[in-house]
Amino acid sequence: LPDGKPISVYSRKHGFPEAERVTGPDLMLELFARDNGLRHYFYGGSPETLQMLEQKLRERYPHLQIAGMVSPPFRSLSAEEDAAEIEKINASGADIIWVGLGAPKQENWMYDHMDKVRGVMIGVGAGFDYHAGNIKRAPMWMQKLSLEWLYRLMQDPKRLFKRYLVTNTRYLWLTRTKRQ
């Protein structure tokens, strides 16, 4: 599920015509709205964000099954701590593990744990903060034009400048120079 426009365009050009952009926050709401019996686990965000997120989700989606919520520390976990976190996630019986650590940390975490975690892991970046009410999403017209990144950059330039302008430029350069 490509969350960014460049990835969806690249995917469609390389044999995946159905690869339309689906943002993590939008996917969350779509799946929460369905009363399908899925158990949801939330990994990431601050304790306050998770508390507010849980409150808002329980109000809006009373049928939603929350299997667990964990705010990991902002440091690397020891091997023992990591094993305990994975055991907690797996013991919860979660079907979907929403990972809100931000890019690229959440992608690295999911890659490192793909053979350990039972359930589908989905990286949602700032999705927890959006749905908890901590930060506002871009206006709908910007979302539809795939300019949400620009809105976020204007809101938090110090933190996002490197990610959006340096890293994304490098990605575009690599995709254009890759030989098929």
Regions found by a protein language model. Give the residues of each.
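Proline-aspartate-enriched helix->loop->beta-strand connector
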Residues: 89-103
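Short, flexible loop segments at boundaries between secondary-structure elements
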Residues: 71-77, 119-155
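A short beta-strand/loop micro-motif in the catalytic core of glycosyltransferases
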Residues: 1-3
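Conserved beta-alpha
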Residues: 8-88, 92
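Short gly/pro/ser/thr-enriched loop/turn and capping motifs at secondary-structure boundaries
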Residues: 7-9, 105, 127-132
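Short Gly/Thr/Asp-enriched flexible loops that form oxyanion-binding sites at enzyme active sites
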Residues: 54, 107-116
